[in-house]
């Protein structure tokens, strides 16, 4: 009994001590506002993980009452020291601080941000509203928040005083100087007629443009070529027949190479819109078989129609009018028709020519 009485006497003496506020734990006082007298670099952070200070079940009436002035020595029901009672049933922040009453409290924060519905059960949410709240004097307090998974908490912990020196477009987009440089390179490639990613600028626009025919102007790859139509006008037709050589512009070079000896050939005169036949390929299709044919005056030694093939006249027939042969051909882009003939198309044209009497037969039928 004597020991118990001595203990309670000692307890009463401690409660009356005026220097109780200076009692310290871990080299600093946590029991009174004398904690605020220390400099920020002398204050030690502490782990409130798992603490039960942040309670969301408290009444929202706490936000309309006065501030509680931090931790105070109060007469409580607990032994020696206890957490202060809040007679107004106010919500306590971490360390017992109410809204704005705690050390490093954010004076710029609105009342709505402290509503219990906005608080998080995570103790860290209350911690930032307590002694280490967000303030303009401590702009880098948000450095160690990555261990929390609550994105809502992180959003509320953004600092008003923190200023970033990088724009969003600098972090997620290509720098403007690099964009400009790439645009310049692409422009140079287009000027040289090179639409690929290589840096070879030696190709001319004509060579790139006329290398091959588009799919609409050529037969499908899995279809066999059955014949070919060459084109001329009134100025070039005589040279075609005299040289027994037909030619087309450079863009038809690859297409003409598919011609083999014995393939049916037809000649279309777009000045008269008539189709002449019947001719037969005497050579493989090639390029510049006779460079002097249709020679280009600007480039001596080069033909204006380098996609060439040698032919022989298989049968002289009356030319066909457009109405008779156009329904057979494959058309694209309006009146244009494909020069490469499939096997059915070539056979149909041969049948039409066969129904025409040759000039020789007509002359033989005339009596002398």
UniProtKB/Swiss-Prot annotation:
Induction: Induced by infection with an avirulent strain of the bacterial pathogen Pseudomonas syringae pv glycinea. Induced by infection with the fungal pathogen Phytophtora sojae. Induced by copper, cycloheximide and reduced glutathione. Induced by tunicamycin, azetidine-2-carboxylate (AZC) and osmotic stress. Induced by dithiothreitol (DTT). Induced by wounding.
Entry's Gene Ontology cellular component terms: cytoplasm
Bias (Polar residues) ranges: 52-61
Location of the protein in the cell: Cytoplasm
Domain of life: Eukaryota
SMART domains linked to this entry: DCD (SM00767)
Entries under Pfam families matching the protein: Dev_Cell_Death
Disulfide bonds: none
Domain DCD: 223-355
Regions of compositional bias (Low complexity) in chain numbering: 195-204
Region span, Disordered: 35-61, 171-218
Classification via InterPro entries: Dev_and_cell_death_domain, NRP-like
GO-annotated biological processes: response to endoplasmic reticulum stress; response to water deprivation
PROSITE patterns, sorted: DCD
Start-end of Basic and acidic residues biased regions: 38-50
Keywords: Cytoplasm, Stress response
Misc: Overexpression of NRP in protoplasts induces caspase-3-like activity and promotes extensive DNA fragmentation. Transient expression of NRP in planta causes leaf yellowing, chlorophyll loss, malondialdehyde production, ethylene accumulation, and induction of the senescence marker gene CP1.
Role noted for this protein: Involved in stress signaling pathway that mediates cell death in response to endoplasmic reticulum (ER) stress and osmotic stress.
The name this protein goes by in its record: DCD domain-containing protein NRP-A
Organism: Glycine max (Soybean)
Lineage, top ranks: Eukaryota, Viridiplantae, Streptophyta, Embryophyta, Tracheophyta
Gene symbol of the encoding locus: NRP-A
